[in-house]
From Swiss-Prot:
NADPH binds at S11, W12, R32, R33, K106, A140, R255, V280, E282. It comes from Rhodococcus jostii (strain RHA1). This is Glycerol-3-phosphate dehydrogenase [NAD(P)+] 2. Gene3D superfamilies: N-(1-d-carboxylethyl)-l-norvaline Dehydrogenase, domain 2 (1.10.1040.10), NAD(P)-binding Rossmann-like Domain (3.40.50.720). It is found in: Cytoplasm. Belongs to the NAD-dependent glycerol-3-phosphate dehydrogenase family. Catalyzes the reduction of the glycolytic intermediate dihydroxyacetone phosphate (DHAP) to sn-glycerol 3-phosphate (G3P), the key precursor for phospholipid synthesis. Its EC number is 1.1.1.94. Transmembrane segments: none annotated. Pathway: Membrane lipid metabolism; glycerophospholipid metabolism. The gene is gpsA2. Keywords: Cytoplasm, Lipid biosynthesis, Lipid metabolism, NAD, NADP, Nucleotide-binding, Oxidoreductase, Phospholipid biosynthesis, Phospholipid metabolism.
């Protein structure tokens, strides 16, 4: 039996820990706050992030990272993208030497413009073959209640990818393996930005034609950037690209879409944050780093640029849309 440490007890970290436990994997979660760990252990519920969801009795938790990591052969990194580096610097000396490191974080690091796998490799010194990412249409609450979903486990080491697949396959969660780590990470990072755009459009009362257009042109941006970085277009046409994009752009469970709706309705970043339980959507932070990464590769991403300008330069949503529609016409 595999032993997994899930570092991070937010909604997705908790849901994926449940998946692992349901698949027969021995799982210990690390929670930053002792009361969250205590709730998981004693009440089998993470009331802060997945209220009302019963967690398996076999799933344990602690606020001691060293205890969680002890003997783990799978280390799941389930903290937000912009805090991954700081956390890893603390955890790295405790991580077992040959453990597979699986990133659930979706984003591009601000400043360095690194993908999450690159951050992991740089901080831990791990061989790239030990680092994997998981990405797909995986809204935490739907998975936590056992609704069927699929995902992609990407790793350049096919043996480790298969081990992760086995450790997380259940009757409701179907992981596919892939070797295209770059494609999975770019799809996961960029979809949050496009979901913000969809939310903004919905927030000002625009309809399905607009949303469909944003999703489709957003996918074109994602593919352009992914290919420039070495991703395979087929990856971005799959679960880690189109699948994740559609789920995040259309579901009311999507924090990024909900955050964008608040902005479209005229709310500030602060009021949108308050409406999403105090959490800033990943796309708000990632839009600037994705934009900068695209610029460094001379890749045009007008939707991403528009989201950045709304979130960080004070541009009104209606004006951003007008500027997009006023661009020079060209072939698809």
């Amino acid at each position: 039996m595999s032993k997994a440490a899930v570092l991070g007890a937010g909604s997705w970290g908790t849901a994926f820990a449940k998946v692992l436990a349901d698949a027969g994997t021995d799982v210990t979660m690390w929670a930053r706050r002792a009361e969250v760990a205590e709730s998981i252990v004693s009440r089998h519920e993470n009331a802060d992030y997945l209220p009302g969801i019963a967690l398996p009795p076999s799933l344990t938790a602690t606020d001691d990272a060293r205890a969680a990591l002890d003997g783990a052969d799978i280390v799941v990194l389930a903290v937000p993208s912009q805090s991954l580096r700081d956390n890893l610097q603390v955890w790295s000396p405790m991580i077992p030497e040959d453990a597979t490191l699986l990133s659930l974080a979706k984003g591009i690091e601000t400043g360095t413009l690194m993908r999450m796998s690159q951050v992991i490799i740089q901080v831990t010194g791990a061989d790239p073959g030990r680092v994997a990412v998981l990405s797909g249409p995986n809204l935490a609450r739907e998975i936590a209640i056992g609704q069927p979903a699929a995902t992609v486990v990407a790793c350049t080491d096919s043996t480790r990818a298969l081990e992760l697949q086995k450790a997380s396959a259940t009757g409701y969660f179907r992981p596919y393996t892939n070797s295209d780590v770059i494609g999975c990470e770019i799809g996961g990072a960029c979809k949050n930005v496009i979901a913000l755009a969809c939310g903004m459009a919905s927030g000002i009362g625009l309809g399905e034609n607009t949303i469909a257009s944003i999703i489709t042109r957003g996918l074109a941006e994602i593919i352009r950037l992914g290919v420039a970085l070495g991703a395979k277009p087929a990856t971005l046409a799959g679960l880690a690209g189109v699948g994740d994009l559609v789920a995040t752009c259309t579901s009311p469970l999507s924090r990024n879409r909900s955050f964008g709706e608040r902005l479209g309705q005229g709310g500030s970043i602060e009021s949108a944050q308050a409406a999403t339980h105090g959490q800033v959507a990943e796309g708000v932070k990632s839009c600037s780093s994705v934009r900068a990464l695209a610029a460094s590769y001379d890749v045009e991403m007008p939707l991403t640029d528009a989201v950045h300008r709304v979130c960080h330069e004070g541009v009104v949503v209606q004006d951003a849309i007008g500027q997009l529609l006023g661009r020079r016409t060209k072939p698809e």
